[in-house]
């Protein structure tokens, strides 16, 4: 048998096997059903921030100023968080201020939700940690059974809760009240914020 024929007999099965392997991956692709969860009221920005094993979602609804609708880094005018449970949206409320939001927050399998909320108290240092331009104190929160309560900080005025697991452990950051000396002059959000876990 010639070398060319042996090479052909070797290559054809390998090429066929690779082609069939690629084809089977294409056929086995998962298909998805996409559902529009909608926005609330006059809000123009809506985002599902988290999904638990029950199919419940944490939904953020926010507004951006005119002309900044396509700029996700823009100043937020307003924000609310909702728990979407089987298609019914429940407003999680606030801690006394106007706005609530989350950092890719979390809803665990028990329906506990974390995020951050403005209080009615102006920040004594003029910080705007919640990012709504109100300069109100921004506190991390835990919502259980649709009842929101503030989580403590590390001695500072502000913080944010980012995620919660099924053991009820919460992570985020909290200020310790100390001035961050590395901030340049004129920076308003100038306090030290440390990673935190609430257990």
PLM ranges: what are they?
Residues 2-199:
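Residue-level hotspots at or immediately adjacent to binding/recognition sites across diverse folds
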């Amino acid at each position: 048998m010639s070398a060319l024929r042996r090479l052909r007999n070797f290559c054809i099965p390998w090429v066929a096997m690779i082609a069939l392997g690629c084809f089977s991956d294409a056929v086995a692709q998962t298909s998805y059903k996409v559902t529009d969860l909608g926005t609330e009221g006059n809000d123009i920005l809506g985002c599902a921030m988290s999904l638990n094993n029950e199919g419940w979602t944490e939904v953020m609804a926010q507004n951006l100023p005119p002309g900044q609708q396509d700029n996700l880094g823009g100043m937020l005018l307003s924000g609310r968080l909702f728990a979407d449970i089987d298609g019914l949206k429940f407003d999680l409320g606030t801690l006394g201020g106007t706005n609530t939001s989350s950092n890719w927050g979390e809803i665990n399998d028990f329906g506990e939700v974390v995020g951050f909320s403005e209080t009615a108290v102006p920040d004594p240092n003029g910080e705007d940690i919640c990012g709504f331009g109100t300069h109100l104190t921004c506190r991390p929160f835990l919502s259980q059974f649709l009842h929101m309560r503030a989580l403590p900080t590390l001695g500072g005025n502000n913080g944010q809760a980012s995620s919660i697991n099924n053991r009820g452990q919460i992570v985020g950051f909290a200020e310790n009240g100390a001035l961050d000396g590395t901030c340049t002059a004129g920076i308003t959000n100038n306090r030290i914020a440390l990673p935190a876990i609430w257990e």
